[in-house]
């Protein structure tokens, strides 16, 4: 049976220990009191059944307060809430998303965040699968060009650093999302 809430923990050190033991990336939700975006994220996005299942199955979820956990949060240079971060098992931040995210887009953010962590651990096939999930879920979605960009990079590294690999994948961005920042970032 799937829990009906995300199994948040509130201790950063515990999250890192569990991440190493369970070999899962850490999803960090940084919030503050009287933050309307934080409230919407908790009440709308993090109560969505599919988001709950994906977070509980794939991540160590930690919930940190912008000011009560100031020593931790300050090291990350955060200035806005809500901020959703993705860290590897050493605690190094690998991806961030700022402000409120609706549930359907959060699924894409989860995939891109996990992919970015996987890429840093040289798990390129896992990263590619996560990024393809974004493309399949929302072929013309707001996160799709970014997913294609990172997939090009993951395929480049998987294939031993062949520029033709990345260029082939990135050609998709030029064709489908020519006005995106992800098209402009290509060398």
Residues covered by each model-derived region:
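Loop/turn elements at helix/coil->beta-strand transitions in domains of secreted/extracellular proteins
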Residues: 22-26, 57-62, 81, 89-92
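Short solvent-exposed coil/turn linkers within tandem alpha-helical repeat scaffolds
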Residues: 49, 96-100, 134-145, 160, ...
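Helix-turn-helix repeat elements of alpha-solenoid scaffolds
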Residues: 119-132, 159-169
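Non-catalytic, surface beta->alpha helical segment in thiol-disulfide oxidoreductase systems
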Residues: 44-47, 78-114, 118
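"A position-specific structural signal for the A-helix of alpha-solenoid helical repeats
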Residues: 113, 150-152
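Thiol-based oxidoreductase modules, predominantly thioredoxin-like and allied folds used
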Residues: 4-10, 30-33, 37, 44-70
């Amino acid at each position: 049976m799937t829990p009906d809430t995300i199994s948040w923990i509130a201790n950063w050190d515990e999250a890192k220990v569990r991440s190493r033991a369970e070999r899962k990336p850490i999803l960090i939700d940084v919030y503050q009191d009287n933050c309307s975006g934080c409230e919407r994220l908790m009440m709308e996005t993090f109560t969505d059944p599919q988001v709950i299942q994906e977070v509980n199955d794939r991540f160590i979820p930690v919930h940190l307060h912008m000011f009560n956990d100031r020593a931790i949060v300050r090291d990350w240079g955060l200035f806005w809430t809500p901020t959703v971060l993705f860290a590897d098992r050493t605690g190094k931040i690998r991806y961030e998303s700022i402000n409120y995210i609706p549930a359907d887009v959060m699924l894409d953010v989860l995939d891109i965040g996990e992919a970015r962590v996987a890429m840093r651990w040289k798990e390129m096939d896992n990263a590619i699968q996560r990024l393809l999930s974004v493309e399949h879920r929302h072929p013309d979605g707001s996160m799709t060009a970014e997913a294609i960009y990172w997939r090009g990079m993951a395929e480049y590294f998987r294939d031993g650093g062949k520029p033709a690999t990345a260029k082939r994948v990135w050609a998709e961005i030029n064709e489908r999302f020519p006005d995106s920042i992800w098209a402009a970032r290509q060398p």
